[in-house]
A protein has these predicted regions:
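Membrane-embedded alpha-helical bundles that constitute the cytochrome b-like, heme-associated redox core
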Residues: 1-204
Length: 204
């Protein structure tokens, strides 16, 4: 039962990622509700995996465990930053909270959202035990190419390093295309996370 709940929570977070990234096309109100849903799923994910946090200072650390610790702590910081900055910028659900500094909140929210996309996808990939027929699976290189194409087309590097503080949205594109692009980027970094974990496992 607990395993099924854990899977449902993880799948829910993966589904919400591309939807949240397409916020301008989805709408501000929907984005805020999706953001709250993501934070609640994040809390549920950590509660379901509370043993991992309890065992941080126990046992030996190999390469994989060190990487997981770094990624998990960064994701925790990112999610807290997204939640606080999101509440500060809210024009709908939390509009009654009037906090100054929305320009800083917007910059933090932008930075955290794109790093969150990368690291949460990477984190998910680290927990994939095995990709069936990976050497003969033609879908892997296809997803990698689609992910790289979307990564470049969406100027992700500019947002990761705040070279651009405003997300350029092409409103002529359909919501589906935008969501698919972010989904492909997410899948790309899941594959990267999976590959890095396998490499570290051979070195351990």
């Amino acid at each position: 039962m607990k395993k099924n709940i854990r899977i449902a929570v993880d799948v829910g977070m993966i589904v919400l990622l591309p939807l949240l990234m397409a916020y301008s096309l989805v709408g501000e109100t929907a984005h805020e509700y999706l953001g709250i849903s993501m934070f609640l799923l994040f809390l549920a994910h950590n509660i379901l995996n509370i043993k991992w946090w309890k065992n941080i200072f126990r046992g030996k650390y190999n390469y994989i465990r060190i990487l997981r610790l770094i990624v998990n702590i960064l994701i925790f910081i990112i999610m807290i930053s997204l939640t606080i900055s999101g509440i500060m910028m809210s024009r709908h659900i939390f509009q009654f909270i009037n906090i100054e500094g929305s320009s800083y909140a917007r910059m933090i929210h932008l930075l955290a959202s794109y790093w969150g996309l990368i690291l949460m996808s990477f984190h998910a990939g680290m927990h994939i035990r095995k990709i069936p027929y990976i050497k003969r699976n033609i879908l892997i290189p296809i997803f990698v190419l689609l992910g790289i194409r979307a990564f470049i087309r969406r100027n992700i590097v500019d947002y990761l390093f705040l070279k651009s503080q405003f997300v350029l949205i092409d409103f002529s594109q359909s919501v589906i295309i935008t969501i698919c692009d972010y989904l492909f980027i997410s899948i790309l970094f899941m594959i990267v996370g999976y590959a890095v974990t396998r490499l570290l496992r051979t070195l351990s």
